[in-house]
Design a protein with these regions (language model features):
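Short regulatory helix/loop adjacent to the ATP-binding pocket of P-loop NTPases
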Residues: 145-147, 175-189
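A short beta-strand-to-loop transition that corresponds to the Sensor-1 phosphate-sensing loop
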Residues: 136-137, 170-176
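Short glycine-rich substrate-engagement loop in P-loop NTPases that contacts/grips substrate
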Residues: 100-124
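AAA+/P-loop NTPase substrate/partner-engagement loops
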Residues: 83-109
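Loop/turn-to-beta-strand initiation segments
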Residues: 58, 94, 127-132, 163-169
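Walker A/P-loop
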Residues: 50-57, 61-90
Length: 195
């Protein structure tokens, strides 16, 4: 049995179960007019694009009260990318949304979660020009960790976000931000945007 690479597992069309069940291509949905138009959030979108323009640590954490439209902003970015109405450095990018719950739910044991995680992140890094959106980012803390292990989703994601191999946009509430993110200096490297 030959171990496949992440890119081979997902393939060029990303049709494999590993990637299609856990990732949603928001840019593709935008091209198919299946996303609601973003209204009145142009300042927040510009702020996000400014952070994504950085060469390293080009990551955004949107913090705001529940229901203020954090997900709508990333969908607005996907629509702008689909229309090619973005700065040169974001052209030909794709915005992908990751379902942490789906990633966890399909894992029967701890090692399988790590394998799925590495496959998904590895495929995004290999594909290049990808922006990963993680909604309810506070769920990263502790997700997939074993009883005697501190290795969870957040710790596995840190190398990708600190090296700049992957652009990440995450969202959370103020309450969860103070509880989860302020205590973790490595996760605080994600640039914060108020929504």
């Amino acid at each position: 049995f030959k171990q496949k690479t992440a890119y081979e597992m997902c393939g060029r069309d990303w049709s494999s179960d590993v990637c299609s069940s856990d990732l949603t291509n928001l840019t593709k949905l935008a091209k198919e007019n299946r996303l609601e138009p973003m209204i009145g959030r142009s300042n927040e979108l510009e702020e996000m694009i400014t952070v994504l323009a950085r060469r390293f640590k080009a990551n955004v954490l949107m913090v705001g009260d529940p229901g203020v439209g954090k997900t709508a902003i990333i969908e607005g970015l996907a629509q702008e990318v689909a229309k090619n109405n973005v700065p040169e450095f974001l052209k030909n990018h794709e915005v992908w949304s990751l379902e942490i719950g789906a990633l966890l739910a399909g894992s029967k044991y701890r090692g399988e979660f790590e394998e799925k995680f590495r496959t998904v992140i590895g495929a995004l890094e290999a594909k290049k020009n990808c922006i990963l959106f993680i909604d309810e980012a506070h769920t990263m803390k502790g997700a997939g960790a074993g009883n005697n292990s501190s290795l969870d989703f957040a710790n596995m994601l840190k190398p990708a976000i600190t090296k700049g191999n992957l652009k990440v946009v995450a969202s959370t509430t103020w309450e969860e931000f103070y509880e989860s993110f302020e205590k973790d200096r490595a996760l605080m490297q994600i640039g914060r945007a108020h929504v």
